[in-house]
């Protein structure tokens, strides 16, 4: 985290939240975030508040996502799960729209009135915690899974129609996008991408894409480890879920599969080879089964194994398509000569992970069943 000058926060945003930063000893710290521009404001902020998080929302998210976040976090709070809460601006609204011609207080209504969408800012309460990007500690992963299980369980009875609807996982669409990319003039000329993309599509022929026997549940949408906070004094204990812009309804297989993909790949996304660690599956599903509602069917939890292969192959297809189309993913110019090169490495890594899961499918399925069967009676 890096201290930044106070004038980097637009005056209209400071006014909207009653922040007299130029007249106080408050510090503004730039926090690591891949999507939204995020700042931690610390000091005497009035009304007994010592810290808040200010964020400028990435345009990929609509401002109405805050209606969903408010509904979910209010429900979590009522269920006594710790969660960051949105802080309303001086006009009583959940977000603030700001541009050079905006009302200094900012208003939700300004979003609809402006021809060019203004910047969207929000404030939220600050939950102190440790951010972890990778872990090899089974107890830490089990605790993370327990938190995810409590999170899902608390939202089982949430009656809310999501306003900001984005498909959490649309594997068929991503595979079709790869087919089209391979068939394009640029794709046909790229032998390396052709070979990799064709292999991905071949394995995808055996994927399970239909989970409609299970209900669509309220999911986080991006359960990577860095979207969980851990207690600083007890790093093995998960504290709360953060980064809630991806909330929505979907199948548990995808959510748990994505968590396993992220948590169980020891080499990370920038390696061409990957092997799924079976110990991660046992720790994660055992922890999840301990904390989720007893009524959650074992078959639905065990669908995580199929979801793991599906999500890994889906991401491989997205990276491979972008290596040809070059339209979505960012890349590391300090480590790779081009966006295409970086995306090919990432595609190979996710495909390698999907192959590893496919090879171990029978063993993984057995481990999943054993983990779920061991959950205590409640």
Please provide the spans of the model-predicted regions:
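Catalytic activation segment of kinase domains across protein kinase-like and atypical kinase folds
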Residues: 226-265
């Amino acid at each position: 985290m890096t201290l930044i000058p106070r004038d980097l926060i637009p005056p209209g945003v400071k006014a909207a939240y009653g922040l007299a930063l130029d007249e106080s000893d408050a510090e503004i710290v730039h926090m690591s975030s891949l999507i939204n521009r995020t700042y931690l404001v610390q000091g005497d902020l009035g009304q007994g508040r010592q810290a808040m998080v200010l964020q400028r929302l990435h345009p990929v998210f609509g401002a109405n996502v805050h209606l969903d976040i408010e509904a979910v976090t209010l429900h979590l709070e009522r269920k006594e799960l710790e969660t960051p809460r949105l802080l309303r601006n001086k006009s009583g609204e959940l977000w603030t729209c700001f541009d050079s011609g905006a009302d200094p207080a900012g208003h939700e209504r300004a979003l609809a009135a402006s021809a060019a969408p203004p910047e969207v800012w929000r404030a939220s309460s600050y939950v102190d915690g440790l951010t972890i990007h990778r872990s090899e500690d089974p107890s830490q992963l089990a605790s993370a899974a327990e938190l995810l299980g409590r999170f899902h369980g608390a939202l089982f009875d949430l009656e809310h129609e999501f306003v900001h609807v984005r498909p959490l996982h649309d594997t068929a669409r991503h595979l079709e996008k790869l087919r089209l990319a391979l068939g394009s003039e640029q794709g046909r000329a790229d032998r390396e991408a052709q070979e990799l993309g064709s292999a991905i599509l071949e394995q995808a022929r055996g994927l399970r894409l239909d989970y409609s026997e299970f209900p669509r549940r309220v999911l986080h949408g991006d359960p990577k480890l860095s979207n969980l906070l851990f207690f600083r004094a007890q790093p093995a204990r998960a504290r709360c879920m953060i980064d809630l812009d991806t909330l929505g309804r979907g199948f548990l297989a995808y959510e748990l599969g994505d968590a396993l993909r992220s948590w169980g790949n020891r080499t990370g996304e920038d390696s061409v080879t990957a092997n799924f660690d079976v110990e991660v599956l046992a720790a994660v599903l055992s922890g999840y089964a301990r904390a989720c509602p007893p009524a959650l069917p074992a078959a639905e939890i065990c669908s995580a194994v199929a979801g793991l292969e599906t999500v890994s192959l889906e991401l491989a297809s997205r990276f491979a398509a972008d290596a040809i189309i070059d339209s979505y993913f960012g890349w590391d110019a300090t480590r790779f000569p081009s966006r295409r090169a970086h995306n090919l490495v990432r595609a190979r890594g996710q495909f390698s992970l999907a192959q590893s899961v496919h090879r171990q499918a029978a063993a993984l399925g057995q481990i999943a069943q054993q983990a779920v069967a061991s959950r205590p009676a409640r």
